[in-house]
C-alpha cells in the first residue's frame, strides 16, 4: 500500500505498508487528515519517519503522539525538538515489520535524510518530480551530492516527494530543456500531469527512470550547471 494523503496547501503525508501489516507514515505535516485516514481504513501505525525539521513536515507529530504515545518517530538531529524519539543520519532502521535504509540527502537542510523502503524512496524536499528542493540551511554542493547519490538508485525506484510541485516544475523544465528530445519528453509529461491535476488527482509517485528523462537537476552534469539551474528556478 502506498498512499499520498494531502495536507496543508500542497504537502503529501505518505503512508507505506505491506498487505495486512501496520503502516509507516512519512513527514507528518498535520495530524487531522492522517488520523482520519488511519481510522477510516482500520490501519495500525508502526512508525513515523521525518526527513527534516520544517514545520510543514513535522507539524502534526506532537498531536499524533497523543493518539499513539509509544510510536517511534525517526528523524535527523535537526528534528530532535520536533518530536523525534530516534535520531538517524545513515544506516538502517529495523522496525517490527520493515527494514528501512536511511539515505543522507542534505542540501535543502543540512541534515535532511531520505528513506528507502523496499524500492520506494521517500525523499522529502530533496528530489521532486521534474525538480529539487531549494537550498536553505544546506549548500549547493551538498544538494548536488545528494541528487547524484539518489541518481545511482535503480531506475525502477519509486520516488515519493513530499510536495505537489510537479506542474510548475515541468513548466520550468520545458523552458530550460537542453535539447528537443528532452523538451518533447517534458511537454508530454506536462500534458499528462495537467490532466491529472484537473481531476484533482496526485501527480505522484514518480519513478527514477522517468525523472532521468524530465528532471533538469538529475541531468546536470556538474556542480556549476546545477547551481545555474537551481538559481534560475529560484527566480523563475
From Swiss-Prot:
- Highest taxon above the source species: Bacteria
Q: Which Gene3D superfamilies match?
A: Ribonuclease Z/Hydroxyacylglutathione hydrolase-like
Q: Which keywords, in A-to-Z order, does the entry hold?
A: Hydrolase, Metal-binding, Zinc
Q: In which pathway does it act?
A: Secondary metabolite metabolism; methylglyoxal degradation; (R)-lactate from methylglyoxal: step 2/2
Looking up InterPro entries in the UniProt record yields: Clx_II_MBL (IPR035680), Glyoxalase_II_hydrolase (IPR050110), HAGH_C (IPR032282), Hydroxyacylglutathione_Hdrlase (IPR017782), Metallo-B-lactamas (IPR001279), RibonucZ/Hydroxyglut_hydro (IPR036866)
Q: How does it assemble?
A: Monomer.
NCBIfam families according to UniProt: GSH_gloB (TIGR03413)
The protein's name in its UniProt record: Hydroxyacylglutathione hydrolase
Query: What organism does the UniProt record list as the source?
Result: Mannheimia succiniciproducens (strain KCTC 0769BP / MBEL55E)
